[in-house]
Amino acid sequence: MRRVMVLFGVVIAGVKGFMLTLVSMFRPKVTLRYPSEKGPLSTRFRGEHALRRYDDGEERCIACKLCEAICPAQAITIEAAERGDGSRRTVRYDIDMTKCIYCGFCQEACPVDAIVEGPNFEYATETREELMYNKEKLLCNGDVWEEALDFRIRKNRPYY
């Protein structure tokens, strides 16, 4: 009698397993085929850094060095020079992406929205030196992602 009960329990467990599989076969898929399919990103996602420009092509950074001062990882290095009209601009703007912790403090501290963390999360490299971003690389990122960056900034600041 005991063997019959054990056998009955095994059969019931098997039927339950098959039912679970059968039900899940007709549910919508939740798996993304990553390289070809990408999931949605939050407008507040913090990815690869970029320096933005004004509409006339001039860089936004005014060399106030607030981002350098607030960076907890000390990943940002800025050198500034004064221009003929009395304003300052950056001569050197470097970010060591191997040190960066993607906290977003630099973006929050910037009074002119010059430094932002963009939507790009695919920036793997083969060497460590490629993760040392200079001003030209950051401006290039800003030019490539400007439309998405502008949308994200407007979306996160509804009261301005």
UniProtKB/Swiss-Prot annotation:
Upper lineage: Bacteria, Pseudomonadati, Pseudomonadota, Alphaproteobacteria, Rickettsiales
Gene Ontology MF term list: 4 iron, 4 sulfur cluster binding; iron ion binding; NADH:ubiquinone reductase (non-electrogenic) activity; quinone binding
Alphabetical keyword list: 4Fe-4S, Cell inner membrane, Cell membrane, Iron, Iron-sulfur, Membrane, Metal-binding, NAD, Quinone, Repeat, Translocase, Ubiquinone
Coiled coil: none
Natural source organism: Anaplasma marginale (strain St. Maries)
Binding sites annotated in the UniProt record for [4Fe-4S] cluster 2: 71, 100, 103, 106
Subunit description: NDH-1 is composed of 14 different subunits. Subunits NuoA, H, J, K, L, M, N constitute the membrane sector of the complex.
Function: NDH-1 shuttles electrons from NADH, via FMN and iron-sulfur (Fe-S) centers, to quinones in the respiratory chain. The immediate electron acceptor for the enzyme in this species is believed to be ubiquinone. Couples the redox reaction to proton translocation (for every two electrons transferred, four hydrogen ions are translocated across the cytoplasmic membrane), and thus conserves the redox energy in a proton gradient.
Membrane topology label: Peripheral membrane protein
Signal peptide extent: none
Protein name, UniProt field: NADH-quinone oxidoreductase subunit I
Catalytic activity: a quinone + NADH + 5 H(+)(in) = a quinol + NAD(+) + 4 H(+)(out)
Gene label: nuoI
